[in-house]
Amino acid sequence: MLMLLVRGTRYESLRSKVVLPTPLGGRGTEVLVSESPSPDTGIRWRQSDEALRVNVGGVRRLLSARALARFPGTRLGRLQAAASEEQARRLCDDYDAAAREFYFDRHPGFFLGLLHFYRTGHLHVLDELCVFAFGQEADYWGLGENVLAACCRARYLERRLTQPRAWDEDSDTPSSVDPCPDEISDVQRELARYGAARCGRLRRRLWLTMENPGYSLPSKLFSCVSISVVLASIAAMCIHSLPEYQAREAAAAVAAVAAGRSPEGVRDDPVLRRLEYFCIAWFSFEVSSRLLLAPSTRNFFCHPLNLIDIVSVLPFYLTLLAGVALGDQGGTGGKELGHLGKVVQVFRLMRIFRVLKLARHSTGLRSLGATLKHSYREVGILLLYLAVGVSVFSGVAYTAEKEEDVGFNTIPACWWWGTVSMTTVGYGDVVPVTVAGKLAASGCILGGILVVALPITIIFNKFSHFYRRQKALEAAVRNSNHQEFEDLLSSVDEVSEASLETSREISQEGRSADLETQAPSEPPHPQMY
């Protein structure tokens, strides 16, 4: 706004140029021009009825002040009523003072629907946006769910409620099965850390060889050897429990007691012991190698499969420590420390966790773990249903069978029978004999079929989804490992992280410059709404 002071008389105008009449602009006229508005004037920085020129994601429109005044609570309504340029700038992303145009870096498709809202007062849902993106856009422009049209409100609310679990119900759709780009990006970011590490290329190749069976021929051989060692360890543990080996160890223990030595010092079969030592050496090599080659030590200890590897070798070393504590003492000393042998037996039982090492090489086991992780609610509901049913039918069976000597002596004793019956296992070790007891057993079995089937269906759907998703993710990572990962990581080996960031900024500036050169010098005249 220009302020003119002519011979003591002040003139103000909103125009950038003011043409004074000839008498006022004649010779000897004193004119004072100022570009700042007078503080004591009530004139706004823009006219209240002036059309609002906006640019939303490249879509330019002129919005009438009358249409915006109908909805003063929206962002554009508040922008139209802004009292100053500073207040208006806080409501938009950028403002071009020369063109008097407000810029918003938002979705242009939603903006077209927003224009329809200012015309009709109703907002319609866009199929091109998911419910969450649509809700974010509506919140940004100051719209609530109450402005949704009646034809779209029910559909929007239904999609918003069912979207988090859509992959359970429609798991066959490609969008629910295909791996997310972020999942592959996580793998890329992990591998990119080798660029700044010492011997990064060698460590990267060794890491991919151990972690990805489809990376190369050596990785496939390594995977086969690892699976064979795990199976051999499990087989040795099972063979050790056979009666022949148990009788041999019992005879050796009797001979040790007769000789005045502790029976805990009896050693296992030499062949099985050597096989056990070999398996432990291989497992220790795997754990230590993965720890040394891991791109992130913190993430290594947070990964469930790595924790399983550690637990698989931990019992052996704990047994060695217990053996050192027991010592090789004889007589009374060995008897005093003999109770520590029970601890050794507990440590040996922990060897059963080695079977979980197969999860590293099995998509099904990993999918099962992911299913249990994301199905804790359904598992909790299943246990709650079983607990209620077992408690009810156990009390009924105890009341009907307590006079009979068939094992229903107490309600806690009936819990075993109720659990076996509700899960339709039916061992038959305890059965009712009275008519009332048999009716209670029939109700328990039918109730178990209904109760167990409901959550199991949901858990099965989740397992199917995670299995297909895991297979798709492995295929995507395997395909990208051969060429895309090699190109990415080769560039990482040559430049540092700072250089990568600089190159990204330069490329972004170049793209911006290209867009500016391609843009027309005169913007098209926006449409009026």
From Swiss-Prot:
Which family does the similarity line name?
Belongs to the potassium channel family. S (TC 1.A.1.2) subfamily. Kv9.1/KCNS1 sub-subfamily.
Provide the topology term for how it sits in the membrane. Answer: Multi-pass membrane protein
Q: What is this protein called?
A: Delayed-rectifier potassium channel regulatory subunit KCNS1
PANTHER family on file: POTASSIUM VOLTAGE-GATED CHANNEL SUBFAMILY S MEMBER 1, VOLTAGE-GATED POTASSIUM CHANNEL
Q: Which cell locations does it reside in?
A: Cell membrane
* SMART domains for the chain: BTB
Q: Which residue ranges have biased composition labelled Basic and acidic residues?
A: 502-514
What does the record's free text say on domains? The transmembrane segment S4 functions as a voltage-sensor and is characterized by a series of positively charged amino acids at every third position. Channel opening and closing is effected by a conformation change that affects the position and orientation of the voltage-sensor paddle formed by S3 and S4 within the membrane. A transmembrane electric field that is positive inside would push the positively charged S4 segment outwards, thereby opening the pore, while a field that is negative inside would pull the S4 segment inwards and close the pore.
- Stretches of the chain found on the membrane's Cytoplasmic side: 1-217, 294-304, 362-376, 468-529
- Write one Pfam family the protein is assigned to: Ion_trans
The UniProt function text for this chain reads: Potassium channel regulatory subunit that modulate the delayed rectifier voltage-gated potassium channel activity of KCNB1 and KCNB2 by altering their kinetics, expression levels, and shifting the half-inactivation potential to more polarized values. While it does not form functional channels on its own, it can form functional heterotetrameric channels with KCNB1 and KCNB2. Each regulatory subunit has unique regulatory properties that can lead to extensive inhibition, significant changes in kinetics, and/or substantial shifts in the voltage dependencies of the inactivation process.
- Organism taxonomic ancestry: Eukaryota, Metazoa, Chordata, Craniata, Vertebrata
An example GO CC term for this entry is: perinuclear region of cytoplasm
Write the record's keywords in alphabetical order, separated by commas: Cell membrane, Ion channel, Ion transport, Membrane, Potassium, Potassium channel, Potassium transport, Transmembrane, Transmembrane helix, Transport, Voltage-gated channel
Question: Subunit composition?
Answer: Heterotetramer with KCNB1. Heterotetramer with KCNB2. Does not form homomultimers.
Q: Please give the residue ranges the record marks as intramembrane.
A: 412-423, 424-431
Motif Selectivity filter extends across: 424-429
Q: Where are the transmembrane segments?
A: 218-239, 271-293, 305-322, 341-361, 377-398, 439-467
Extracellular side, ranges: 240-270, 323-340, 399-411, 432-438
GO BP, one annotated term: regulation of potassium ion transmembrane transport
